[in-house]
Amino acid sequence: MILPQRVPGLLRRAVRIGLPISIANFVVAASQMIELLIVGRHLGTDAFGGVSLAATFSLVLILAFYSLQIAVQAVVSRRHGARDYAAAGAALNTALAIGTCCGAAIFLLFQFLGPQVFVAEREEISALAFQYFRWRLPSIPMLVLILSIVGFFNGVGRPDVTLRVYAPVLVAHLAMVWAFTGGLGAERSLGVRGAGLASTLSTAMGLGLFVWNLARPAMRERYGLLRFRTGVTRAAARPLVAIGLPIFFQQILGNFSIYLFQVIAAQVPDQAATLVATNIALLFINISTLPGLGFGTAAAT
């Protein structure tokens, strides 16, 4: 039972944790919309449609590993609350090892798949989607690791770290999308490949900043972070798998329906314009859920 006198304190803690998470998620969703608008302005409606299709497919893959973020956050918050800092660090070290293996498997799998992954009535849309996806693919393994790290910082009550990393990375990402898709002149445009390359480079920047925060001497000493020979254990893996695996399949089933919605939109006669409209609608729906997601994360922590 929560005593009435504890409510203000709990509310302050929920706001302190939940508000940065909500803001960070909103900034990410807004940047996705701006990226698509830049692509559409510089490269046309077909490019917008192709990038929309590939970006949604990428999002399905990435959100499946949101399960790892939730699992890390759940384990770390409990271990941190019990002041078992070594176990909290072991949870992240083990999650990073799991994420590295899963990310490498995804990268290798999709090296052997062609444009047939992106089903559209017009081959031009499928080809543009595949071009974008191939240049964005290296970012997906890195994003799996980033999700684990975000879960760790949420679990120790430091979501502000995520916000401080996301802000400069997303600005750099949009600047690169603008530059690589024709902002510096049509003759220097890389087309949709430039948008995919911008995602990969900005993700590498973000991962580097997160690792820099983890590698600080005080963090490594307290939590034993980034010690993979001794910090990766079966004991740490068991709760991560027990929590994360059901959520993984839940995310796959739930979010694959979003991709199917995009595939259906890609079959109509004016498919490029339809993909534009459906993607914008999906982004607005996503943005509307972000406050609940942020404060739900705070409540779980």
Regions found by a protein language model. Name each.
Residues 19, 31, 35, 68, ...:
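Residue-level signal for transmembrane alpha-helical positions in Major Facilitator Superfamily
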Residues 12-73, 242-265:
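Signature of the first transmembrane helix
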Residues 25-29, 63, 103, 136-140, ...:
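Residue-level hotspots within the lipid-embedded alpha helices of multi-pass solute transporters
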Residues 30-49, 118-123, 179-185, 189-190, ...:
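Helix-terminus/linker motif at the lipid-water interface of multi-pass membrane proteins
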Residues 66-69, 73, 136-154, 162-173, ...:
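Short runs within selected transmembrane alpha-helices of multi-pass transporters and secretion channels
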Residues 35, 72-73, 113-114, 149, ...:
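Hydrophobic/aromatic residues in alpha-helical transmembrane segments
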Residues 1-21, 76-142, 172-175, 179, ...:
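Short alpha-helical transmembrane segments in multi-pass integral membrane proteins
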Residues 50-107, 146-157, 161-162, 277-301:
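Small-residue-rich hydrophobic transmembrane alpha-helices
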